[in-house]
Amino acid sequence: MNYSKRFRVVPGSKVDLSKVDAGFKDKHETHQDALGVIETHNRKLHDLQYLMYAEGKRSLLIVLQGRDAAGKDGTINHVLGAMNPQGCSVTGFKVPSKEEAAHDFLWRYHHHTPGKGQVAIF
């Protein structure tokens, strides 16, 4: 499967989350299968992060959504463990503060979006 086409949001396009399958599972049904795939691709992730940083033109925002204890922290640790932590940031968002609630919905996210060559995980 070509994941870059399935999950990529093209700049300027409109996203309809009701059309996204939130229960998507790939052929790797077991935890052990998934860990094997992660290990296989860790070096490539590391190399691609370095190239993106060196190019300095693009950034990557990864949005993980799930309830408490859904495995978001484990996903970050396993999948992004090969990346250079100096080029990554992880931000969790809880209930908006009074200041955040006084602004538009996306105001609190803008400050945490990644700069060129950087990776951010929400």
Task: Name each model-derived stretch.
Residues 1-122:
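Glycine-rich phosphate-binding loop of ATP-dependent small-molecule kinases
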